Regions:
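A conserved helix-loop-beta module that forms one wall/lid of the active-site cleft
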Residues: 1-41
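ATP-grasp fold ATP-binding core
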Residues: 5-8, 12, 39-55, 83-104, ...
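Expand to "…catalyze enediolate/carbanion chemistry for C-C bond making/breaking, isomerization
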Residues: 7, 21, 32, 55-56, ...
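Glycine-rich phosphate-binding loop of ATP-grasp-fold ATP-dependent ligases
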Residues: 19-22, 45-74, 109, 132-133, ...
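Short beta-strand-to-turn element immediately C-terminal to the catalytic PLP-Schiff-base lysine
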Residues: 25, 60-65, 113, 124-126
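Hydrophobic alpha-helical hairpins/lids featuring a short glycine-rich hinge
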Residues: 86-145
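ATP-dependent carboxylate/phosphate-activation module, predominantly the ATP-grasp catalytic core
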Residues: 122-175
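A long amphipathic alpha-helix within ATP-dependent nucleotide-binding catalytic cores
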Residues: 159-201
Length: 201
C-alpha cells in the first residue's frame, strides 16, 4: 500500500519525527480556514499523489499569497497530475497539503528499504538531497552511503558515526540524527514498511 505525503507525515509525527506544521485542503472552501490555522509568512503547497517528480510537473508551489494558493487549488483539485513516475494519464489529485515553509540550511537524502539480496534492512543516506537519488547514484556514487541493520533491526553506533561523517554533520547534529534514526527504524519495523524515503531531509 502506498501512502500520501500527508499520511506519512502523520505517522512520522506519531513517532516523534520532526515535520512542518500543515493543513489539508480537500476543496476550495477549506483554503481560508487552512491559511488562518497556519498563520505563517510563507507556504509550500503540494498536490498529493502517489508519485515523485511533483515539483518539476508543477505540483508544488512556494508562495506567500493566499490568492496564489487558491489558484493552485483550482488548477489541481479533481485533476490529474502527470510526472515522470506516472503514466500518460497521471494520477488524480484529491487533496492539497499546505505546509509552513521551512528554512533550508542543507538538503540531505535518507531512505530505509528491504534489501532483497541480504534479506535485511538497508539504510541509505546522501548529502545530495532534494534531487532524484537515482541520478546521484549514477553520477556521484561516492556520495551514496549504505549500512545494514543487524539481525535485531538495530543500527550500530559505528554505522551512525559513519553516516554522520558522510553527511558532514557536527556533534550536535549527530546526536539528533542518531535519535531520529532510531525512531525512523521503529516506524519502519513496527508498521512493516518496505520503503521509506525522506528527500530532502
Amino acid at each position: 500500500m502506498n501512502l500520501h505525503e500527508y499520511q506519512a507525515k502523520s505517522l512520522f509525527k506519531s513517532y516523534s519525527l520532526p515535520v512542518s506544521k500543515s493543513e489539508l485542503i480537500f476543496s476550495i472552501d477549506d483554503i481560508e480556514q487552512a491559511t488562518t490555522n497556519l498563520k505563517v509568512k510563507e507556504y509550500v503547497v503540494k498536490a498529493q499523489v502517489h508519485a515523485g517528480g511533483r515539483g518539476k510537473a508543477g505540483g508544488v508551489l512556494l508562495t506567500k499569497s493566499p490568492e496564489e494558493i487558491r489558484e493552485f487549488c483550482k488548477k489541481w483539485l479533481g485533476k490529474n497530475l502527470v510526472t515522470y513516475q506516472t503514466d500518460a494519464k497521471g494520477q488524480p489529485v484529491s487533496c492539497i497539503l499546505l505546509e509552513e515553509c521551512t528554512d533550508i540550511e542543507k538538503e540531505l537524502y535518507l531512505g530505509l528499504v528491504i534489501d532483497r539480496t541480504t534479506r535485511s534492512i538497508a539504510l541509505i543516506a546522501s548529502p545530495e538531497g532534494g534531487v532524484d537519488i537515482e541520478t546521484v547514484a549514477t553520477n556521484s556514487p561516492e556520495k551514496i552511503f549504505k549500512v545494514f541493520l543487524n539481525s535485531s533491526n538495530q543500527i550500530k553506533e559505528e554505522d551512525v558515526d559513519s553516516l554522520s561523517m558522510g553527511l558532514n554533520l557536527n556533534n550536535s547534529q549527530t546526536s539528533d540524527f542518531s535519535l531520529m534514526l532510531k525512531n525512523l527504524i521503529n516506524l519502519f519495523t513496527e508498521k512493516d514498511f518496505s520503503l521509506i524515503e525522506i528527500n530532502p531531509l
